[in-house]
Amino acid sequence: MLNTLPDFHRSFAEQLKLKLQSDSRIHSLLAGGSFIHGGFDQYSDLDFVVVIDPLYYDEIMAQRMAFAGTLGHLLHAFTGEHVGEPRLLICLFGPQLLHVDLKFITLDMLTQRVEEPAVLFTRDNDALKRQLAKFSAHWPNMTPEWFESRAWIWLHYAVVKLGRGELFEALGMLSFFREQVLGPMLFRRANLPQRGVRRIEALGIDPDGLLTSTLATHDRHSVGIAIRRAADAYVNLRADALPDNIADDAARRAVLAMLDAYSHKG
């Protein structure tokens, strides 16, 4: 299973597996991310789920940084509260740089998940299989209504930042809009799981250049054009699966009218 990885990643994963197999507190080691989705290459991160014996869970959680430090030359690490997952430790190992995610759970916590993990080792295969069988993996694709209820609010934010002259803020929102709205909708159009803007270039799922049309420089006119093209791209993609909450499309008209007014300002 690990022999499909690039040499550097494989070496780290094999050492991690041996290290955890020798630690009786560890029940199982699972892998996810690109290991599951495919396309693993030299630029990929390693994503692991470390399943801990409940008797030692609090102990290991309290010492996660030190625990990670035993796995290699740990340069820096921080926990995943910013993505709503405090059990996650995001690590950078060196001297050859490698990003490794370690999620610490007990077997009972292995419930809701977005993917079926690869099992690198387990001390109780039957117990692990029973737990995995209780819940099916569910990829968190967003609904048409989810996009519609947010799209015009976020585009309005970009417009008012343009109006104030906060071009960096507007540029940041355009990037956010591509990642949260346009990218996922392009994946939807291609009948693929929604994954932000991940590997869109390699997948070739934006043949019309909808995303690149929304790129702008730090210039008021350029940002104004990019916001309008972002709105146009959204309407284009929205047509694939019309949401129930369009109503009379008043939000779209109001946002574009404000954009017209601010685009001619200054």
Each PLM stretch: what is its role?
Residues C91-L128:
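Acidic, glycine- and histidine-enriched catalytic cores of nucleic acid- and nucleotide-handling enzymes
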Residues E116-W146:
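A short, charged helix-loop
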Residues A31-G33:
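Short gly/ser/thr-rich secondary-structure transition/capping motifs
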Residues K19-Q21, L29, F177:
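Hydrophobic C-terminal alpha-helix "anchor/cap" residues
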Residues S136-G266:
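Conserved nucleotidyltransferase catalytic core and NTase-mimicking acidic/glycine-rich helix/loop elements
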Residues H37-Y43:
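Short glycine-biased active-site loop of nucleotidyltransferases that positions the nucleotide triphosphate
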Residues M1-S24, F35-H37, V50-L102:
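Metal-dependent nucleotidyltransferase catalytic core
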